[in-house]
Amino acid sequence: MSDVIKDLSELRLSYEQGELYETQVASNPHEQFLGWFNHALAANLHEPYAMSLATASASGRPHVRTVLLRGATEAGYDFYTNYDSQKGIDLAENPYAELLFYWPSLERQVRVGGHVVKIPEQESTDYYHKRPRDSQIAAHISTPQSGKIESRELLQQRFQDLQQQVQSREVLDKPEFWGGYRLQPDYYEFWQGRPNRLHDRLSYEKIDGQWTLHRLMP
């Protein structure tokens, strides 16, 4: 074990891809996010819309997982899940979360923090019906999400059983326990890797309805 840790300590890169100055960024952090996000899309990165979602229980126990961004406006950043999942339980107890986008080939990351609310039911329904049919079926049978199941075979059998049951239906109803959340941002941090670990970090904090820009120590 000590040899592994020693080896890891030797693994390091010098960040040379870019720089980030106050004069270069938008006054609105969502516009700044869209600029970076569109750059990541244009660079053909693998799933640049994947993001880490950090939540915490009422007792302060943190949980983090990767989810997919499914909407981004000034009103907030959307993702969908089972309301009975660990993330759903956490958000019912403690409706604050943080998102992290990491684009290593661009040497960039973005943190977005804020209050989380459920997306209106009709919006969740509309999105559900845009999903592939098999993904709709999976949402029905994967409950409670994160619950224990005896085997992969049992999960597959439930999936196939429901496939057969609904094959004649044109529309499959959205499960009541499934839908969307919207993180309403009050904090952003944009990170650009720089040489010698003197990274650029610019934060936007919402104070009295206005965004305030600060440079942070690396």
From Swiss-Prot:
What does the record give as EC number?
1.4.3.5
Alphabetically, the GO molecular function entries are: FMN binding; pyridoxamine phosphate oxidase activity
Q: Which InterPro entries does this UniProt record tie to the protein?
A: Pyridox_Oxase, Pyridox_Oxase_CS, Pyridox_Oxase_N, Pyridoxamine_oxidase_dimer_C, Split_barrel_FMN-bd
Stored PROSITE patterns? PYRIDOX_OXIDASE
Q: Which residues bind FMN?
A: R65, T66, V67, L68, L69, R70, Y80, T81, K87, Q109, Q145, S146, W191, R201
Which keywords belong to this entry? Answer: Flavoprotein, FMN, Oxidoreductase, Pyridoxine biosynthesis
Does Mitochondrion appear among the keywords? Answer: no
What is this protein's function per UniProt? Catalyzes the oxidation of either pyridoxine 5'-phosphate (PNP) or pyridoxamine 5'-phosphate (PMP) into pyridoxal 5'-phosphate (PLP).
Which HAMAP family does the record cross-reference, listed alphabetically?
PdxH (MF_01629)
| UniProt similarity note | Belongs to the pyridoxamine 5'-phosphate oxidase family.
UniProt-recorded name of the protein: Pyridoxine/pyridoxamine 5'-phosphate oxidase
Recorded source organism is: Acinetobacter baumannii (strain ATCC 17978 / DSM 105126 / CIP 53.77 / LMG 1025 / NCDC KC755 / 5377)
